């Protein structure tokens, strides 16, 4: 059985290894922007509190803080490869990263709760604000993962 991509010609002269950080950063930025764009769109379409409770923006703010916390710690600091110990050293970096991931997963779970508890279970006519809250948090979460694990730190080796 042959693959369906065998006929696709891809130039071997493109070196994606050197552009990995650039591509990962752009992809993470697009995901982050898309998440906030979706929730801003929902807030503009449904400005009343009856259709869209604007306290639901807290999930996106917490996801953004988690995005920043996760990416503030380098992989070298978590592994203990850094040259200076800093304030708390490797243990502090791991705790910081753990709290960041807890906030990220918590905001994603809370956005699902908002979608299903606030819109689907109540059988509201308008479900788009709940979907927007979920997709905002999902895009920010996956953008944070791409930005954290899609880049390399060994630029000079």
UniProtKB/Swiss-Prot annotation:
Topological relation to the membrane, as annotated: Multi-pass membrane protein
Modified residues (Phosphoserine): 2
GO cellular-component term (any): neuronal cell body
Alphabetical UniProt keywords: Acetylation, Membrane, Phosphoprotein, Transmembrane, Transmembrane helix
Keyword Transmembrane: yes
GO biological process: late endosome to vacuole transport via multivesicular body sorting pathway
InterPro entries: UPF0220
Cell compartment(s), UniProt: Membrane
Pfam family, one: UPF0220
Ranges that cross the membrane: 26-46, 58-78, 95-115, 126-146
PTM-bearing positions, type N-acetylserine: 2
Annotated family: Belongs to the UPF0220 family.
Protein's UniProt name: Transmembrane protein 50A
Organism: Homo sapiens
